[in-house]
Amino acid sequence: HAGARAPAGPRATRPLLLGTYTSEGGGGTGIGTAAYDTGTGAITPGPVITGVENPSYLAPHPSGATVYAVSEQGAGAVTAVAIGPDGTYEVLGSRPTGGSGPTHLSVHPSGRWLLSANYTSGSVAVHPIAEDGSLGERTDLVTHSSPPPGPGQGGPHAHQIVTSPDGGHVLAVDLGTDTVYTYRLDASAGTLTEVSRAALAPGSGPRHLAFHPGGRFAYLACELDNTMVVCAYDPATGAFTPGPGQSTGTGSGTSYPAQPVVTGDGAYVYLANRGHNSLTRYAVEGGGAVLRLLDTVPVGGDWPRQLALSPDSSLLFAANQRSSTVTVFGVGPDGSLTGAGAPFPAPVAVCVLPLP
């Protein structure tokens, strides 16, 4: 008997992955790897996972054993990367998305399906995920052929695809058609069936949404009319009901708001404003039904394209595309944001993914 071992506390550093555009001048050569200090937010660089072109968005598998990347290019693709217990990474292979310019992907909570959004071609795709995390042949491709595109849009532009917190529906946000589509996913066939659609203001350019943890409200950033929209979601029917556009606190004109995130307790929402180079803070009230604008905070970088909270919502990471940096903030219990250290250099940083 070797004596009782004290239970291991949470590890002081956890992995952090970085998306980039490999095709841009000054861009990275693949998916960046790093580690972050779970207390201070300090980031330490690691090697690059090469062999993935334009990995502009990254999504984890619920098991923690795999991560997925889009290749945002003409012949769109999605790639699976295995994460070894020792922290090493191995590319498992890629599959075509059936469209062009995929900008977003997410894993269905069952862990069995990968959902991706082809921005340029305006379609959404489904791929099966095997036991080892690798991807099978695409099982569906749905093009947002109606309604007609909004003002100034040449066609549909699917920008995001996510599963509702209850797991019952898949929602796709289309910037070109100013529409959020609700689908049911056939969990055995991997096919999508549209059940409803929600119209946003013409020309608003809906881009990304984030659900409140209560599962009945979502917050949608519209990048062309510079608004945040509180949307009600009905888990029974999948109906998605947008409210009026609300201020981002960034003044007149558009600041191309990019992505909202919601703290784990559902108390605060943060929004990245690319043109304004700021983070808007909102307090969540009314059980998720109301956003109260608090203020805007400088992001400390240029063109914040994507935000991510650490798993415990104690840290906020911002990927700043034009300054090629990641800035980190400590998140207070009162929703305050406090800069944590110097910006971390990351070439053409367009996505940051802190892993649990």
Describe the function of each predicted region.
Residues 21-23, 72-74, 119, 129, ...:
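Short loop/turn segments immediately following the C-termini of beta-strands
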Residues 27, 52-63, 98-112, 146-166, ...:
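Beta-rich, blade/repeat-based domains predominating
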Residues 34-41, 80-87, 126-136, 183-191, ...:
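Short loop/turn segments immediately following beta-strands, especially the blade-tip
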Residues 44-111:
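Blade-loop segments of beta-propeller domains
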Residues 44-50, 90-96, 139-140, 146-152, ...:
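A short beta-strand motif characteristic of beta-propeller blades
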Residues 322-327, 334, 338-356:
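Blade-level signature of beta-propeller repeat domains, shared across WD40, Kelch, NHL, RCC1
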